[in-house]
Amino acid sequence: NVKWLYANKGNCEIVMKIPKELITEAQQQEFFDVFGDYCDRISLENFAPCWPQFDVEEKTGIKITEGIYNQPITRTDTCPYIFYGMSVNADGLVSSCFLDWERRLIVGDVREHSLREIWNSTEFNDLRLQHLEGRRNEHPVCNNCGQLTHCLPDNIDPYQPVLLERFKAHLASR
């Protein structure tokens, strides 16, 4: 029960969202009316092609013309997520990306290494360098990432030169 969850959430943030393309305006209002008092944030989002192997437009018949938050669709060189997140799968394999459902971006295994070791691993840092050096397009998975064109909350491209310099200095100091 969502009402119970919200009342007992503690420090957990409850976020409600739904794709707006498949529901009517009346259903959109109903969504806000039903869930608005039982969450910290609520929103309607656009469909986004986050997974390269899944064609959202083909599956839904809806042409995607804006980003998930109604922003313009733009290409970026650098993924911000790899600098503040990673995903631990149920089997202990660690991916550099929360969208890596096919497990093509594995950077470690928590059964063999600590999260700190994986976070600071050569594999993970090489991926970060590739992005900071503007070579994301060379990566077989990251190259076609719809998350970065359609869903990006943080664009760090304007800071890419200084971040690259600082990241290289950080790696050299270790």
Which sequence ranges carry the predicted segments?
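Nucleotide-sugar-dependent
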Residues: R75-D77
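Conserved AdoMet/S-adenosylmethionine-binding subsite of the radical SAM
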Residues: N1-I64
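Flexible mid-to-C-terminal extensions adjoining Fe-S/redox cofactors in radical SAM and related proteins
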Residues: V94, L99-R174
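Short secondary-structure boundary micro-motifs
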Residues: Y69-P72, G92
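Short, acidic, Ser/Thr-enriched surface-loop or helix-capping motifs
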Residues: V88-N89
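Short, small/polar residue-rich loop motifs at catalytic or cofactor-binding pockets
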Residues: P80-I82
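Charged, glycine/proline-rich intrinsically disordered loops and linkers
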Residues: Q53-N70, L164-L171
